[in-house]
Design a protein with these regions (language model features):
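Cytosolic, long alpha-helical scaffolding segments
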Residues: 1-224
Length: 224
């Protein structure tokens, strides 16, 4: 009976994750193709959908908690779905913020070729997808692999910031555009962090190990 209530929520979480992953993709597609319609669609159509998902999923999870008072594994599953719902909502919010930066940049000459931003986006999209897959499949090993990708995202963020600081110091006319590019990189990095939040919960649910606040070396170690 309880499993029959949980499975539809899992399916909705997959749909929700696909939506926010596509939002990230649209923002970067618009930036690369200099086409404002993509980020505008994220703001005008997709963001309201994420808000509806977040509210509906929250209500369903709270209803299950109240009606069934689940214990042990079922309780951890419901609590994790609530946490995942909030992480996906934040990813949607960050995608909308990125859309505004992208529109600003589309309307102006490029500071530099966009190479690392789309690379970051591709990795972050895979992190969103695999974090949810790890939850659905109870795959803690996949969750730990996502931690490794987060290191790459952080390195790309740092590289982008270093390059743009150089541009700004040599040509002050690039400052405003450079700041928006830095904002994009920081938002992508935060989206990666929300994906790792989900993976931390997966590891706890599957292995019973709390890895929040651990350093990266301990997070991605193999279980003995």
């Amino acid at each position: 009976m309880l499993e029959e209530r949980i499975m539809p929520i899992k399916r909705e979480l997959i749909e929700y994750a696909t939506l926010v992953e596509n939002m990230v993709e649209k923002v970067i597609k618009g930036l690369m193709e200099k086409e404002k319609s993509y980020p505008l669609e994220v703001i005008e159509k997709d963001e309201p959908r994420t808000d509806r998902y977040e509210l509906e999923l929250d209500e369903k999870c709270v209803w299950i908690l109240a009606q069934f008072q689940p214990m042990a594994v079922d309780l951890r599953t419901i609590l994790m779905m609530l946490e995942m719902n909030r992480d996906l909502e934040r990813i949607g919010d960050l995608s909308s913020t990125m859309s505004r930066s992208a529109i600003f940049l589309i309307e102006r000459p490029q500071v530099k070729p966009y190479i690392d931003i789309p690379r970051m986006s591709d990795i972050v999209q895979s992190m969103i997808r695999d974090s949810v897959n790890a939850f659905i499949e109870n795959d803690s090993q996949l969750a730990r692999e996502v931690f490794q990708r987060d290191k790459t995202v952080n390195a790309l963020r740092d590289q982008i910031i270093r390059e743009l600081l150089t541009f700004m110091s040599s040509d002050p006319t690039t400052i405003e555009r450079s700041f928006d590019l830095i904002s994009l990189a920081l938002d992508l990095e935060r989206i990666g962090d929300h994906s790792t939040n989900i993976c931390e919960d997966v590891v706890f649910m599957v292995e019973g190990e709390v890895i929040k606040h651990m350093d990266d070396k301990n997070k991605d170690k193999d279980r003995k």
